[in-house]
Structure formats: C-alpha cells, structure tokens
C-alpha cells in the first residue's frame, strides 16, 4: 500500500504490486490513471513515499518438472516479472495481452533475462490479434499431452482470470492467480477486499492476493 508523503488527497493508500526486487531497492510499475499515479509520475529521486508492506502472500515456486506458463493481462503483468526472474531457469513460457500496443509492458526486460514473450493485443497493433486466453488455448491445443506438465501463474482482469480458470480445467492444469482488488486498510480489518472462494470469503490483502485458481468462486461475481 502506497501514498505520497504529506498528501491527504487521495486519503487512502493504494495497493501496488512489486515489479522487481533489486539489492537494496524495489521497483513498482504503474499506469497513470488517477490522482495518486499522477502525483507519482512527478516524483523525483530522493522524494519520500509512504509504504506499508509487503502484504499477503506471493506466488509459490513449484518444485518438480512442471514448466511454468505465465499469463499477464494489461497492467496485471506487473507482478509476474519478479516471478519470471526467479524461475527463469525453468524456462517459463510468458503470454502478455493488452488492449493495444502501447499497453504492452516490459518486453525489453523479459528479453534481457532470456524470455521472449508471446504477445497479443485486442486490436492487433502488436503481436497476434485477439485475447491472450485465445493464444493460450492455441498453444495448449498443440503442446499439451499426458506427458507434458505445466503450471499456470497469472494476473490480470477478472474476466481474463475467469476464462483462464475454465480453460485450465479443460486441459487438467493447476495454477495460481493474483487478484487485483480495491483495498482500504491493507491489514485485513476493513474487509473491503474480500472474495468468495470454495472455502468461504477470504481477504485479498491477508490470505491473498495469490490463490489457487480453482479456489475462486467466479459464479459469485
């Protein structure tokens, strides 16, 4: 959770995912869409921000031979880069989707760690035209078999994650999704970020934001 120093507008901190961990620093990737991000874009080196975190859990690194498939939708791609760096030795397959070319993020950084992403845009301005889940379906249709094991990691719009969960079920794949929800307190007290799961309501800021994809009750949306 992050806010600009000495600012009461916006009053509440906003949740941001961790883009990259460095030796003594962290990087946050954001899109300028509201009051806080408009303040952030004008910040300079040595300016002060107020941060509470880290909150909740992260993506688990699965042991074994399963090859990771990472799927990011729009700004939801941000938290997947740190994971990609961590598991690059497992040769992850990375799908990135967005509405248009200008919303495709950090492909240069992925290539610098040896990952060439599979890109799709809704309008066809970069990569294949269509939804990122359509690209994944084509890939799995041609590469999935009883002797091939994949593990899904994803973050993005809820509609994308819902479709991804259904698609993964058809191919008998397991995986993890990071949910993007509005938060007020970030410590589990206000319950503004609860989601319905097969094990009852859970707080994204405490029990999440990462959940096994099959745990979320999408029909409750």
What do the predicted segments below correspond to?
Residues 79, 158-159, 180-209:
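Local cysteine-cluster metal-coordination motifs and their immediate loop/turn environment
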Residues 7-16, 56-63, 205:
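Short, Lys/Arg- and Gly-enriched loop/turn segments at beta-strand edges
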Residues 35-143, 147-180:
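FNR/FR-type flavoprotein reductase catalytic core
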Residues 1-4, 51, 195:
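A generic structural signal for residues embedded in beta-strands
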Residues 1-45:
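Ferredoxin-reductase
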């Amino acid at each position: 959770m992050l806010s600009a120093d000495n600012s009461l507008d916006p009053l509440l901190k906003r949740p941001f995912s961790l883009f990259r961990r460095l030796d003594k620093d962290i990087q946050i990737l954001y899109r300028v869409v509201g009051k806080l991000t408009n303040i952030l874009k004008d910040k300079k080196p040595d300016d002060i921000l107020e941060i509470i975190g880290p909150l909740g859990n992260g993506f688990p690194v699965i042991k074994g031979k399963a090859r990771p498939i990472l799927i990011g939708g729009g700004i939801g791609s941000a938290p997947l880069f740190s994971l990609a760096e961590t598991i690059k030795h497992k040769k992850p397959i990375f799908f990135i989707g967005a509405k248009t070319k200008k919303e495709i993020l950090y492909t240069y950084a992925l290539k610098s760690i040896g990952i060439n992403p599979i890109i799709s845009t809704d309008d066809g301005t970069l990569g294949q035209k269509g939804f990122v889940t359509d690209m994944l379906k084509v890939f799995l249709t041609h590469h999935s078999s009883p002797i091939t094991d994949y593990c899904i990691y994803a973050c993005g719009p809820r509609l994308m994650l819902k479709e991804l969960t259904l698609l993964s079920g058809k191919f008998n794949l397991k995986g993890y999704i990071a949910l993007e929800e509005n938060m007020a307190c970030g410590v589990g007290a206000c319950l503004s970020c609860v989601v319905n799961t097969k094990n009852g309501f859970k707080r994204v800021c405490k029990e999440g934001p990462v959940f096994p994809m099959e745990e979320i009750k999408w029909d409750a949306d």
